Amino acid sequence: MLNASYLLAIICRRFWRYVWKIRCVFPSKSLTTFFLNDGSRFDYPLKTAIGCSLFRGEFESHEIAFLQETLKPGSIFLDIGANGGFYTVIAAKQVGVTGHVYAFEPGHSELEILRHNIAINHLTNVTIVECAIGNKTGKAQLAISSDGAMNSLAKTNHPQQCIEYWQSVEIIKLDDFIQKSGIKKVDFIKIDVEGAEKFVFEGFKNILLSDNEIKIMFEASDLNASAFGYSVKEFLENILSSGMKLYYFDKTSTLVEIRDYDPKFGKKIYNFVASKDELI
């Protein structure tokens, strides 16, 4: 006889499989409204991986809790790969009118959603920067996917990256942007750029030298990194060798320190946090 927890797991799997199927009746660009735990409103297409995760109430809740715990009124937050602005909206509310959020997004469709979400939340402390971030300043080609969260500066091995066309975009090193903008201090950087994370790091060496309390949250997997010619192992070991502390969110979403590379990190997408000081 099936025990209750096993039966519940089966029911849940079948329910969400059904939800995943019926999402296809929604027009791909129509927006669904989600209300976040801080009272903010976030509109996003349901027919996407992020949209379905939001519908299930499962989208990076522990990462958001860490962000909200870390950011203070007056903090400066950089959202690199802002997409529709999920992190931007939450961070803007957290840092308040004395803080500021810089949201970097090169994709045209994503920029429309980002502007929309900033407007409906009446946010006045956000600057949108229409460009990609990397280890050079100039021009680049962005692969536009049917699911905007899969947009990337390369054709990756991610099965959900369905490229519709390529878009020419501006790209800039973060150090160059900081210098041009006159930003004195950066408190938190979130990076989600579908494989180009290592190149983003290479472009803000001056920030790492000057800001001792900076926190950097980023994702990485070999599925995406391999398209850019590097491995997650190489990337994480470079961070550790620089003297920074490195952490990841485990299966229970607890923040765990990384002292040595574990092969599991390359096999699936993990969210990591790099910091100069101890977090746990």
Q: Which residues does each predicted region cover?
A:
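Phosphate/nucleotide-binding beta-alpha loop and adjacent structural elements of enzyme active sites
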Residues: 1-280
